[in-house]
Each structure stands twice: as structure tokens, then as C-alpha cells.
A protein has these predicted regions:
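Ribonuclease/tRNase effector modules and their secretory precursors
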Residues: 1-84
Length: 84
């Protein structure tokens, strides 16, 4: 089941996007200097070490002490946090 979620997300990688508020939230939470947070998140998701799993309607991607939350229906990046 884990591999299925990962395969589905990776096959839809071009659909991943976020909102203006999402950009601000992700930049603040991860302390990023880049304006292209979607590219940053996609690169993390594409990393072979990324742990991808689904809970409810969301997909979660964990790598490098970062947790990215993506809506599994719209592929919208909702938020990203540092894992403490």
C-alpha cells in the first residue's frame, strides 16, 4: 500500500501546486529563501529517501526532517513543517 501511494504521487508530480498563502506558509515554516517552494517540495518528494504515506485525504512526505502535506485529490501542497 505504501508503494502504491508513492507511485500515484510520483506519476502525478506535474500536478503538484500550492496557493499564494501556501507559499508564504511553507517559506515561513521551513525558513526558505527561495520563491519556488513548489520546486523545492517536488525535489524532496522525488528523492528516493522520501517516505510517502497516506492518512485520510492527505499524502505526507517525510525527508530530511521535513514533513510535506499534500491533498491527495487536488495535489495541492497544504503545508510543510520541520520535524522536531
Amino acid at each position: 500500500m505504501i508503494f502504491l501511494n508513492k507511485d500515484i504521487l510520483l506519476s502525478n508530480i506535474d500536478k503538484i501546486h500550492t496557493t499564494g498563502m501556501g507559499i508564504d506558509r511553507i517559506k515561513m515554516n521551513l525558513k526558505l529563501d527561495t520563491n519556488d517552494v513548489v520546486k523545492f517540495c517536488k525535489n524532496k518528494i522525488l528523492d528516493n529517501n522520501c517516505d510517502i504515506y497516506k492518512q485520510g485525504k492527505n499524502l505526507y512526505c517525510e525527508i530530511d526532517n521535513i514533513k510535506i502535506t499534500i491533498n491527495s485529490y487536488s495535489y495541492t501542497i497544504i503545508t510543510a513543517h520541520l520535524i522536531k
